[in-house]
Amino acid sequence: MTIIADLTGTTATGHSSWESDARTRASRLEALLGDPYDPANPHGLRALFAADARSAPPAATEDLLAGTDLGAEFVPVEYGGRLSRADLLARVLRPVFRRDVALGFGYGITSLFATGAIWAAGTPTQRRRTADLLLGGGRATILHHELAHSNAILRDEFTAGATPGGYRLNGRKDVIINAERADVQVVYARTDPARGPLSHSVLLLDRARRDSPSVRHLPRVTTSGMRGALFSGLEFTGHPVPGDARVGGPGEGVALALRTFQVNRSLICGVVTAAADTVLHSAVRAATTGRRGPVARRWHKPLAGVFADLLACDSMATVVLRALSLLPDRAHVAAAAVKYVVPDLLRENLEELATVLGARGYEHDSPQYGALGKLVRDLPVAGLGHAGTASCQSVIVPQLRGLAEHSWFQEAEPPPELFRQGSELPLLDYRLLGLAGGGDFMAASLVGSAARLASYRGLGGQIAALAELAEGFVTELRALCEECRRLPAYGTATLTDPAVCVLSDRYSLIVAAAAVLGMWEGQDGRDPFLANPAWAVLALSRLGERLAMPVPELPDGCLAQVMEELVRRFRTGRSCDLDGIALAQ
């Protein structure tokens, strides 16, 4: 059964009440963190880069965040927290990630990743105690097998053998973020030696259960990126865990991982784009410093192109994060697609921006230009490296044949509120998140967008180009549909088959195109730039080139319009995302 929760109205300002509150908190946090380029700011980029160089957390900034009760952002509103929707959480966290990815993970977001299983399947007591812990400034961390991200940091495994009173936990993991600082640990442990969907269970360990002779704390591990985050290890040897520490049913660990990681994947992509925004500002600074006239024409394509890509990334992440509230049983494939596409786009974007920054990109301690090198190091450690691709493919590939046979070109479009910023959406409820089936609302949206734009084809100008691009992506979806219908039955296709991997590549880029079109159509006209098709045309053209599909020539003035907006946002101190918020200066 498809779940579409009831929608309520908006405030007089045109924004939902939850959204207005989130905007206020994000603006307050941005102001508290202050001008990132001020060398005297203890929370500015110079101070954060210095802490990173020392491989130390930025203590002053962590204290500042503690004073904002940031932990409340990770607690559902029904338990006294501020977690209303995932898209609004991303908005609140962006001021932190705009300055330092390691700070965003090390201080805050890891607690949400750890406690997602508790919000999804915990007992009332587990949920209440966890909420009280986070609301009181405590932290949680997560210990799991590589099923989470397929990241090299997450390869060790824990086992938990059944005992009359619960479990005996064994295993070692050398690289765990906040292993020493966390007040609770959520462990994904193998409880069944057989391979299969019921192999793992989730255990909740508090500090009292952790501090015992059967637990050994391992030394801190140095990482190439996120150097200010504290990674260390834990080893359990016959550690007793009571039965009431299990979260959910026995063998429910894999299902809980698949359900909760769709929030994690989408949220990471929604906040890390803010860090890339900082690098884009650095590149525009490099291209404009010392020039009285306009930016040199040779920099228009990379700068405007990266800006369009960031808007595409934000569109994709925002749509999926909103879907977690509006269509919670249908968002799992789109969540994997966003995690598949956004890291690749960001890596390519950083390479393009490096050409603009030139030698300035090597000024690693410079607040104006040092963000590039740090983000290049941080992204892989944050789970946004090449290693994370396989876990997304493992979600997408098994669904493709079923989507081709039963969903594509057959399913109704999603509610328009999915794409309308300011619409009131249901609260995020982890208990409603699905992990299989449910159709493909993004493909349906793409087909609908193309149909509405069809009458503009051949008329010339940007709207005609947008219509041509939309139809081009529908053509790609139709071709993909035919190929996916020929896939072998589920379980016989292998992720090591390059042809299968290419199908997930193509599908994920089509989802990105659908998000761009949906967000463009959902504009209410209050932002003239976003209501104009120029940014969407440029974003779709770049996505189409990655798909090697026929792409029309950019209409006259398209690149210039996007470039003009980028320079305007740089000079007026505004973010390069869909919100275009005022940044601290």
What label would you give each PLM region?
Residues 48-180, 197-198, 325, 388, ...:
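Glycine-rich flavin
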Residues 123-131, 138, 143-147, 154-159, ...:
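Gly/Pro-rich turn-and-neighbor structural signature
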Residues 172-216:
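A short core secondary-structure module
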Residues 274-277, 301-314, 336, 340-351, ...:
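Generic structural signal for well-ordered, non-transmembrane alpha-helical segments
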Residues 504-562:
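C-terminal structured domain segments
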